[in-house]
C-alpha cells in the first residue's frame, strides 16, 4: 500500500486546477499517514503497541470485548461486556460491520452506553451509560 494515498501535507494543486510552487522535490515521508485503525467487536481483547513520531509508543485496540462504563447515578465505573453495537452516527455502515468508534451506541451488560474515547488512538473503550 502506498503511503502517498494517506498524505497529510498541503495540496499541490490550486482550486483552479493549476499547480502550486513546490517547496521540495518529493513528498516528505514524515507527512505520510496510514489507514484508519478501527477496532472490531471480537471474542478477545487484542491490543497492538506501535512506535509513532518522536519515538513515542501508542496502544491501539484491534479487537475488543469489554468497555469501561461510567454510571452517572452511582458515580462509579464498571467493566462491562459489550454485547452489540446498536448505532454509529459517524457512519451507519460501521454498526453493521461491528466497528467501534467515538460516539457509537453500544449495548453492554449494564445497559446502553455511548463511547466517549477514541479506541484506535487511546487503546481503551470508555463509555457513559445512557439513562
From Swiss-Prot:
This entry's Gene Ontology molecular function terms read:
structural constituent of ribosome
Extract the ranges annotated as region (Disordered).
Answer: 11-36
Q: Where is the composition biased (Basic residues)?
A: 16-30
What Gene Ontology terms for biological process does this UniProt record contain? Answer: translation
Q: Which UniProt keywords apply?
A: Ribonucleoprotein, Ribosomal protein
Which GO cellular component term is one of those annotated?
ribosome
The coiled-coil regions, if any, are none
Q: Keyword Ribosomal protein, does the record have it?
A: yes
Tagged with keyword Ribosomal protein:
yes
Q: Which NCBIfam families match?
A: eS8 (TIGR00307)
Oligomeric and partner information: Part of the 30S ribosomal subunit.
State the family it belongs to.
Answer: Belongs to the eukaryotic ribosomal protein eS8 family.
Name of this protein:
Small ribosomal subunit protein eS8
Lineage, top ranks: Archaea, Thermoproteota, Thermoprotei, Thermoproteales, Thermoproteaceae
Amino acid at each position: 500500500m502506498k503511503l502517498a494515498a494517506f498524505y497529510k501535507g498541503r495540496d499541490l494543486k490550486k482550486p483552479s486546477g493549476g499547480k502550486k510552487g513546490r517547496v521540495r522535490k518529493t513528498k516528505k515521508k514524515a507527512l505520510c499517514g496510514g489507514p484508519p485503525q478501527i477496532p472490531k467487536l471480537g471474542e478477545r481483547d487484542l491490543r497492538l503497541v506501535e512506535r509513532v513520531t518522536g519515538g513515542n509508543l501508542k496502544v491501539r485496540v484491534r479487537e475488543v470485548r469489554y468497555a469501561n462504563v461510567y454510571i452517572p447515578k452511582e458515580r462509579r465505573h464498571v467493566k462491562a461486556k459489550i454485547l452489540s453495537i446498536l448505532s454509529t452516527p459517524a457512519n451507519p455502515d460501521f454498526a453493521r460491520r461491528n466497528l467501534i468508534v467515538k460516539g457509537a451506541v453500544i449495548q453492554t451488560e449494564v445497559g446502553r452506553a455511548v463511547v466517549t474515547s477514541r479506541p484506535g488512538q487511546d487503546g481503551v473503550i470508555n463509555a457513559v451509560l445512557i439513562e
